């Protein structure tokens, strides 16, 4: 039986916000039966289930529907919020073309592969190993367009750099120094470095969704594993990290649960529902 945090009133929780990859979605890109059951119990308990992911909407939507989620889905690190059933975009905060061009040129000069997202489609320079790896992870098609800077003439929702973890750590430091707050920069997974409009985050998107649902963010429990989940956990009344989470979450999380492989979030959700009056 999972133990809930001391001081948490289960009856006060009105929503849970959940990252996907490595939080409730395993490395095999599947939900465990326990996770599907636990999330499915939330609606009957009067708790809204909110998916908050760095994934594209086209990639996240099937997962949200599999879980039976009806609340708006937070995608692209918070740059896009959309209705999982109608597909309507409720919020979109893309990077303008000049900023996107500057990012593309900086990443290209560093010699890394990158993905560019326009109109919820994935575009790459060429279909190389990195492009195929990402497209497989997202379960979507990548479109090769050649020179990305020359091709891009519209705002882009975000840009993702693909590479080895240590190399991306160094690039992240370089890009943060170069852009100096002019872009959101964070890792979603060890091999994915994400860049978006400054001010974009899962936390700001959670506040937007809560306002639409008439929920106080203080009445939300948020779950995450990555450095890109810091703002999500900060925005919620209670932030919960999985056991193998990025070290950046340690000072933010008010509670920890076992890893996705051990159904940590599912256990917490079951305990939460079972403890409500």
Q: What are the residue ranges of the model-derived segments?
A:
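Mg2+-dependent phosphoryl-transfer enzymes with acidic/Ser/Thr/Gly-rich catalytic loops
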Residues: 3-15, 32, 194-277
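Active-site phosphate-binding/coordination module
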Residues: 33-131
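Active-site T/S-Asp motif of two-component receiver
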Residues: 18
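Hydrophobic packing residues within well-ordered alpha-helices of enzyme cores
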Residues: 35, 60-64, 171, 175, ...
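Conserved ATPase-coupling elements of RecA-like P-loop NTPase cores
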Residues: 27-31
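Short, structured coil segments at secondary-structure junctions
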Residues: 67-69, 76-77, 179-181, 235-236, ...
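Conserved acidic, metal-coordinating active-site core of Asp-based
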Residues: 106, 110-223, 227-231, 235
């Amino acid at each position: 039986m999972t133990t809930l945090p001391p001081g948490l009133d289960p009856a006060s929780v009105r929503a849970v916000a959940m990252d996907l990859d490595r939080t409730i979605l395993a490395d095999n890109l599947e939900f465990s039966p326990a996770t599907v059951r636990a999330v499915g119990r939330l609606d009957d308990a009067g708790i809204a289930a909110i998916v908050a992911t760095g994934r594209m909407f086209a990639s996240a939507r099937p997962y949200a529907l599999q879980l039976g989620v009806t609340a708006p889905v937070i995608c692209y690190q918070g740059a896009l919020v959309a209705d999982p059933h109608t597909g309507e975009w409720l919020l979109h905060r893309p990077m303008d073309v000049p900023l996107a061009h500057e990012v593309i040129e900086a990443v290209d000069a560093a010699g890394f592969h990158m993905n560019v997202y326009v109109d919820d489609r994935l575009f790459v320079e060429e279909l190389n190993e990195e492009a195929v790896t990402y497209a497989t992870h997202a379960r979507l098609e990548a479109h090769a367009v050649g020179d990305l800077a020359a091709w891009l003439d519209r705002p882009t929702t975000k840009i993702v750099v693909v590479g080895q973890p240590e190399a991306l750590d160094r690039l992240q430091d370089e890009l943060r120094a170069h852009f100096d707050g002019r872009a959101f920069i964070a890792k979603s997974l060890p091999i994915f470095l994400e860049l978006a409009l400054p001010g974009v985050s899962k936390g700001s998107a959670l506040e937007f969704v809560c306002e639409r649902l008439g929920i106080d963010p203080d009445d939300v429990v948020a779950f995450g594993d990555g450095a890109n989940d810091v703002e999500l956990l900060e925005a919620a009344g209670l932030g919960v990290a999985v056991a193998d989470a990025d070290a950046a979450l340690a000072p933010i999380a008010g509670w920890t649960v076992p890893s996705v492989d051990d159904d940590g979030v599912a256990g917490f959700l079951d305990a939460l529902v079972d403890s409500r009056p």
